[in-house]
Amino acid sequence: MIPQTRFPVEPWAVREVGLNLDQLAQSESVFALSNGHIGVRGNLDEGDPHGLPGTYLNSFYETRPLPYAESGYGFPEQGQTIINVTDGKLIRLLVDDEPFDLRYGALREHERILDLRAGVLRRTVEWESPAGQVIRVRSTRMVSLTQRSIMAIRYEVEAVHDPARQ
């Protein structure tokens, strides 16, 4: 269970300050985005670590039989289960040939904000690689309400102190 203090109460926003790797699966559910046609869980842009990454499309499902001990009127013979499709949200970032992975190096800052008024998920991360390079990553994720099949991510990377190798 997620402690109530993890998400300060704010009008029109859900804010998470810091990152608890033990509760990623729960927070991925809290930061999910959907428009009725496409749904994406709020997992981290770089993919790892993750609880349960997910991208779901309306009308993309599998059918399965629904067995009953006794048949009866109105008992469906088949059920439908929505399928997790290929994850198109992954962004792999290398910082001087080291993968950007929050499990290694030092996490200096991490904040996620689900802006309920704008319908976007914003994330800010400041991370120091094991070799000492410091970067700041800002991302904004959205699913379009007007073009229902579009999901987009704006991903900005900034070298904080020294310029990283080009």
Features from the language model and the residues they span:
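Beta-sandwich/jelly-roll carbohydrate-recognition scaffolds of carbohydrate-active enzymes
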Residues: I2-Q166
